[in-house]
Amino acid sequence: MEVILLERVNKLGQMGEVVKVRDGYARNFLLKRGKALRATADNRAKYDGMKADLEARNLASKAEASKVAEKIQGKNIIVIRQASEAGQLFGSVNVRDIVVAFEADGISLARPQIQLDAPIKTIGKHTITVAVHPEVEVEITVTVARSQDEAERINRGEDISTRNEDRDAAAEAIAAAGEFFDPEAQHDDVEPAPAAEETEK
């Protein structure tokens, strides 16, 4: 289906462009959310008539979005999750979790604004793009950790995996030492040296 974009759409095109997309994507996203019109002769004429108004509204919303962008640019959001010693999460961190974390910090964002290709499944720092406006994007950091203390250590640049490896190595060393130590064992008695025979006088 060919559509006329009413705003810039990431990886698709700019306002006013006529692009060809899959029917399902057009119906369920672009048309439903008012981001495009079917590229019919009537709608082309309709777009020409509303172009100036669309551009004015776009400039106004872009200005507001820029203010939000200034507030969140470079922001570090901390999300606490349970994970294995190897740093693999028991679950994942998704778009909803990031939106909730922002809300806890007094910032309201919509899920479509968070550009996350796949759920986060590991401990560490992850860079995420937030599209506060079709023409305004910023990068933020999501630090996923098992505790607030661990999150602070990750943000200081400490190698959490090395700490875990050292702890595991120490545990293995203690276990290995236990295998060779028998607390019930007793030292063998040392036989006394035989007494020297008296020399016959």
Curated annotation (Swiss-Prot):
Gene Ontology annotations for the cellular component aspect, listed alphabetically: cytosolic large ribosomal subunit
Q: Which GO terms describe its biological process?
A: translation
Biased composition regions of type Basic and acidic residues, renumbered to the chain: 155-170
Region (Disordered), start-end ranges: 155-201
Alphabetical UniProt keywords: Ribonucleoprotein, Ribosomal protein, RNA-binding, rRNA-binding
Q: Pfam families recorded for this chain? A: Ribosomal_L9_C, Ribosomal_L9_N
Task: Please name the Gene3D superfamilies in this protein's record.
Answer: Ribosomal protein L9, C-terminal domain (3.10.430.100), Ribosomal protein L9, N-terminal domain (3.40.5.10)
- GO terms for molecular function, please? rRNA binding; structural constituent of ribosome
**HAMAP family on file:** Ribosomal_bL9
Protein role: Binds to the 23S rRNA.
Family statement = Belongs to the bacterial ribosomal protein bL9 family.
- The molecule here is called Large ribosomal subunit protein bL9
Question: Coding gene?
Answer: rplI
